[in-house]
Amino acid sequence: MANDKIVIHGARAHNLKDIDVTIPRDKLVVITGLSGSGKSSLAFDTLYAEGQRRYVESLSAYARQFLGQMQKPDVDSIDGLSPAISIDQKTTSKNPRSTVGTVTEINDYLRLLWARVGEPICPNDGTPIASQTVEQMVDRIQKLPERTKLQILSPIVRQKKGEHKKIFEKIKREGFVRVRVDGDIHDISETFELNKNQQHTIEIVIDRIVVKSGDRSRLFDSFEAALRLSGGYAIADVIGGEPIMFSEHYACPICGFTVGELEPRLFSFNAPQGACPDCEGLGIKLEVDEDLVVPDKSLTLAEGALAPWNPISSQYYPEMLKQACEQLEIPMDVPYEDLSKADQQTVLYGSNGKTFHFHYQNDFGGVRDVDAVFEGVINNVDRRYHETNSDFTRDVMRKYMTELTCQTCHGFRLNRKALSVKVGGEHIGMVSDLAIGKELDFFNELSLSEQSLVIAKPILKEIRDRLSFLQNVGLAYLTLSRSARTLSGGEAQRIRLATQIGSNLSGVLYILDEPSIGLHQRDNDRLIGSLKKMRDLGNTLIVVEHDEDTMRAADYIVDIGPGAGENGGEVMAAGTPKQVARSRKSLTGQYLSGKRFIPLPETRRPGNGKKIRITGAAENNLKQIDVDFPLGEFVVVTGVSGSGKSTLVNDVLKRVLAQKLNRNSEKPGKYKSVSGIKNIERLVNIDQSPIGRTPRSNPATYTGVFDNIRDLFAQTNEAKLRGYKKGRFSFNTKGGRCEACHGDGILKIEMNFLPDVFVPCEVCHGKQYNSETLEVEYKGKNIADVLQMTASEAVKFFEPIPKIRRKLQTLVDVGLGYVKLGQPATTLSGGEAQRMKLASELHKQQSGKNFYILDEPTTGLHSEDIRRLIGVLDRLVDAGNTVLIIEHNLDVVKSADYLIDLGPEGGDGGGTIVATGTPEQVAEVAESYTGQYLKPVLERDRAREATAPAK
C-alpha cells in the first residue's frame, strides 16, 4: 500500500470505541477533543506505544531487560508507522545539577569552545596566561622590529621573603655573570645583603640580544636555559618597551597562578576538575534562615515564635527553651521582635559557653538531668540536618533552611581556574547566565583571531543553531544556568522540542502533548513555525492540542468525541481545518467556524472595594513593582512567557499569604510590604499536583463523598442484619477488603527481563472487596459497582440523597463527569487533578472571604471545557470570593473582571506592570502584547453576539 498514510484499524485503548483512523504522513496533524475524550489514548497509548514497542522488540533479550518491553496496545493493526518519539510535559530531572545547558547539551559545546580557544587571564593581576613551546617563543621574538634590544631573563625567585644566599651561590656555579634583583641589574660578583623580612624578585640575565634574522639558534639556547632554571618561565625584557612573559605551563609568570592544560572537563561543574570546591558545583549552599525559623516575630517565645521548636510536635525542645530562658534571664512573654539584640542572638545562636541546668522527664519515664550549654535554635537545626540518619528529620529541618548563593564561586558553580579562562572577554559562567536571546547576540558578535576562528567555527555553528531553536520555541528569556527542576512542564517540553529540531532527523513520528502550554499568543506563533520546520524536514507531527491557532495552522485535524470518558472515544471529524469547521457533529468544528463561542460577560464585577497591596516586589526579574489585587473579583495575571507572572503570584503573593494566614514556613520572594490581608480568611492554592500518590486514592475519597456512600451502605437492612459498620466498606482496612490483594484489586508479578506485569486479583477479580461485603447492595448495586460508575452516572443513581448528589454534581460541573469514582488518583492528569480540587471547593460552605490561586487552569481543556470552567470560577466569585489566575488563554482573559499585564518582554526585559484594568481598558494599551491580541478577540465576539439569534 502507499506509504503516505498511517492507517489504524480497531483502536480500543481505554475508552476508544474500536475506531479506524487514517492520518497523513509528513504532515502537521492535530488530535483534539474534550478533556477525557480519548485523544491521549489514540496518540500516546496507541500510536506511540506501538511505535516504541516495535523498536524495542527488534532488540536482543539482553538489551530489552534494560529498556523494558512495552505492552502491545489494544489495536488490530497499524500500517505505515515510523519510529516514534514522544515529547510530553513530564518535567525534566529533579537533580539540582541538571540545568537548561546540560539538558540541551549546549554546555558540552560551550566547554569545548572554552577549552580550545579560551584565553586564561590571571585573576590576581590580570596577566594573560599562555602555554608556549620554545619555538613559539622564538617566533614571537623574531617578529619584533630588527635591531630591537632585549635581554632574556629567567625568574627564579618571585616575591619571596629571605636573604636567598644559596640562590646567588647557585647562579655563580652555573656560570652566569649578571642578575636582576628587584628590578636592578647587578654583577654576580657583588656581595648581596638582602632584607630577609621583605619580598624579593631575582631574575638571571641569560643573554643580551639585538634582534636580527640569523639569531634563531642562539634564541633557542637562551630560552631553553631560562626555562630549565626557572621551572618553565622566561621573560623577554625589551629595552624601551614592555616586557614579554613566557611560560611553558598554563601558569601566571608573575604570581604563579596555575590553570593547567585546558580540557573540556575543567569547565564542567559536574566534574571534580571544574567544580567549585566549596559548593561542589551546585552554586548554592544551604543555610538555616532566621526568617523561616521565626516566621512571625510578633509572637512570644512562650507562644511558639521558634517554629522548629513548636510544642505541637514535641515537648522536649519547648521545655529546654523554657528552662534555659529562666536561667539565662530571657523573657518568654515578650514578642520576639521586642527582645534585645543580645537575647535574640542567644536564642538563635546559643549561650556562648554559659551553662544551664536542664531536667526533663519524657512520657516513658526516661529522665535527663544535666548541666548543658544552650546551643540555640539555628545551631540546633543545622546540627540535626547534617547529623541525622532519618530522611524524615532531614526533610523537616530542610524547611527552615534556604539556598544562598555560594560566596566562593558567586553562583557560577565553577572553580577559580575555570572562571579565569575567557572567550570574548567573558568566562563561561557569565555567558551561561545571559538570557538565551542575549547569549545568541554574544556569539553572533564574537570576534576571534584568525587561528581561533578556524578551530571555533564548527563549534560556534552548533551553539548558534541550538540557541536559535530555543529562541524559536519561545524560550529566549531562559538562561542556560537555570536549574532544570524549576522549569514548568511546558518549558521542559519545548526544550526537548528544540533539542529534537537540532537533531535534524527525518522520517520520524513525533507525538507532542499540548506544546502551547504556558505560551503567550506572541510566542505561540514562533512555536507553530518550529513545528512546521520539523514537518518540512520530512517528519510526521501528531500534536494533542486545543489551541485554536495551532489547529488552524495544522494540515489535518482528528476530532475525538462526542463527550468524555464512556461518552467519548469516537472520531467526530477528520480532515483539513476547513473541512472540520464545516462538520455539524464536531464540537471543535463549531468553535472553529464561530457557530459556538464563549460569550463575553454582560458586566464586569466592581469587587468589594478592598484590595491586597504588595509593594517593592523584586524577586527574580521583578523591577521593584507595586501591585494591587482587587478583592471580590475574577483577576487574571497575563504577560508574555518569562515576564514574571509566576514569580509575582507564586513566589511572592502566594507565599506571603501562606505565611501570614497558614503559618507556612516557605520564604516569600523579595518584597517591601503587604497590606489588606485582614480582608481575607483563607488562601486556597489549586495547583496541578496529584490528589494522591497511591492507587487507593481516588475521586470518591478525595472529595469526601466516599464517606457518605459508606454511611449509606452501612444503613442498609442487609448491613444492619450482619452488623456491618461503615469501616466494613473501606478497602484500606481489614474486614471488608479482599485480603489476597490488600484492597488494591491488582497483583504485581515480577518478570525478570520483562517489565513487571499487573494482573487483576484472582480472588476478588479486581473488585477490591471480599464476597461477603459485595453481598450488601443499595438499589441493586454493591460498593464495587458504585466505584465503577462515572460521576455523571452516580449523580443519577444517588438523585434522592442530596448530600451525596451535591458533591458528585460538582465533579460534573467542572467537566469531570466522565471520571469513575474509583479511578486511581495516579492515572489523573494534572489538569484533572486541578479540577478535582476545584470541585471539592465548590461543595464546601463558602464564607465569601476565600482567596483562590490557580496557575494555568486551562491546561488540557477544550473550548467547551473552558466555558464550563469559567462558569465554575464565576460561581466562586459570585459567592464573594476572589479568584486570581495566571493565564494566556484569551477566552479566559476576556472573561476577567480585572487584568494585571506584566512585561513588556520576557526575562530581563520584563518584570514591570504594562497595563491594569478591565479587558477593554488593557486592549487599548498599545504597549501591551496581551492588549494587541485581546482587542480583535473582543471586537470579534461583540460582532458574533450582535448577529447571534436571540435565546
UniProtKB/Swiss-Prot annotation:
Keywords: ATP-binding, Cytoplasm, DNA damage, DNA excision, DNA repair, DNA-binding, Excision nuclease, Metal-binding, Nucleotide-binding, Repeat, SOS response, Zinc, Zinc-finger. It is found in: Cytoplasm. It comes from the Bacteria. ATP 1 binds at residues 33-40. ATP 2 binds at residues 639-646. One of its GO terms (molecular function) is ATP binding. InterPro entries: AAA+_ATPase, ABC_transporter-like_ATP-bd, ABC_transporter-like_CS, ATP_grasp_subdomain_1, P-loop_NTPase, UvrA, UvrA_DNA-bd, UvrA_inter. Residues 309-587, 607-935 form the ABC transporter domain. A zinc finger (C4-type) spans 252-279, 738-764. One of its GO terms (biological process) is SOS response. One of its GO terms (cellular component) is excinuclease repair complex. Forms a heterotetramer with UvrB during the search for lesions. Belongs to the ABC transporter superfamily. UvrA family. The UvrABC repair system catalyzes the recognition and processing of DNA lesions. UvrA is an ATPase and a DNA-binding protein. A damage recognition complex composed of 2 UvrA and 2 UvrB subunits scans DNA for abnormalities. When the presence of a lesion has been verified by UvrB, the UvrA molecules dissociate. This is UvrABC system protein A. It comes from Lactiplantibacillus plantarum (strain ATCC BAA-793 / NCIMB 8826 / WCFS1).
